[in-house]
């Protein structure tokens, strides 16, 4: 699935099942929450902490949650993620680490 297809898929899902998008500020808060959940799994999987009994720890699901909400924000604010990714990939935008 391309980023363009993902943006369309999320938009169709929101309009069909979600009724409408949450406000941009609410979605920013939700994105922060999802990143926190991802960070918890990373800390317990690769860091010094351990999982608590019964704690959810599907890394892929959490990454997908982060991407979903990021796509929601892009859709709401009119950002084409494909073009934005191409833009930041230009040599003048990113300096390779030597």
Q: Across the structure, where does each feature detected by a protein language model lie?
A:
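Flexible "arm" and connector segments at domain edges
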Residues: 1-63, 67-89
């Amino acid at each position: 699935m391309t980023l363009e297809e993902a943006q369309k898929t999320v938009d169709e899902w929101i309009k069909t099942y979600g009724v409408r998008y949450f406000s941009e500020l609410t979605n920013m808060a939700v994105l922060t929450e999802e990143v926190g959940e991802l960070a918890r799994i990373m800390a317990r999987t690769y860091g010094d902490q351990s999982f608590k009994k019964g704690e959810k720890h599907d890394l892929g699901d959490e990454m997908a949650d982060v991407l979903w909400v990021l796509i929601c924000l892009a859709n709401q604010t009119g950002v084409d993620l494909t073009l934005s990714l191409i833009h930041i990939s230009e040599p003048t935008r990113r300096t390779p680490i030597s």
